[in-house]
């Protein structure tokens, strides 16, 4: 059983079989530090996940695992190279990651570990090469808000900086302190936005 491991931009080969480890991860389900992918067919889409994990607290992708936790296995070795393309070509700056393959019931599962980056934001390039920064909230990759971008920009300054928010942004942040979750309707009402134009 040959497995490939990508550390930074170096590819190494090692053997590893650990059904119990993968089953434990799968039993946790998808959450803020873990996402399942049935397959990798688009490097740009994977770049969004890499951006989200790198901009938040890091995490892992399990490739060859369906959303319901069923292990389907990776279909081809090309998926490892698509991950590398996502990290180096479609993430700016490039994302350092570690990839390990595991054999589970004769099927191959890829584990991709992404560390939180120091130099935020990490952008994912879309089909027109426009950069978009993502963050991870619960089990979803969400576009970073202008507030996030402003905070990251100011955090790069060595002396620190005071970040000011608009009245709408402050109301939204205050509401999020009280409640962990807000619906779109609640956000629109708090910020006095028209629901139709927001969507």
Regions picked out by a protein language model, each given a short descriptive name:
Residues 14-199:
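Conserved N-terminal catalytic/coupling substructures associated with nucleotide/phosphate chemistry
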Residues 1-13:
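Single conserved hydrophobic/aromatic residue that forms the stacking wall/gate
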């Amino acid at each position: 059983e040959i497995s490939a491991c990508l550390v930074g931009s170096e590819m190494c080969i090692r053997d590893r079989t650990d059904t119990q480890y993968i089953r434990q991860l799968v039993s946790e389900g998808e959450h803020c530090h873990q996402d399942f992918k049935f397959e990798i067919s688009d490097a740009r889409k994977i770049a969004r996940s890499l951006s989200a994990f790198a901009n938040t607290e890091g995490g892992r992708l399990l490739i060859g695992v369906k959303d319901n936790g069923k292990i389907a296995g990776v279909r081809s070795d090309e998926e490892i190279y698509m991950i590398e393309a996502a990290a180096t070509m479609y993430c700016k700056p490039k994302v350092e990651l570690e990839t390990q393959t595991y054999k589970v019931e004769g099927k191959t599962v890829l584990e991709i570990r992404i560390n939180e980056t120091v130099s935020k934001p990490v952008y994912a390039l879309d089909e027109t090469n426009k950069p978009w920064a993502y963050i991870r909230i619960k089990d979803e990759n969400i576009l970073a808000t202008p507030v996030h971008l402003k905070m990251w920009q100011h955090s790069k300054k060595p002396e620190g900086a005071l970040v000011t928010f608009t009245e709408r942004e402050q109301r939204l942040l205050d509401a999020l302190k009280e409640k962990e979750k807000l619906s779109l309707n609640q956000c629109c009402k708090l910020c006095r936005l028209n629901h139709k134009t927001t969507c």
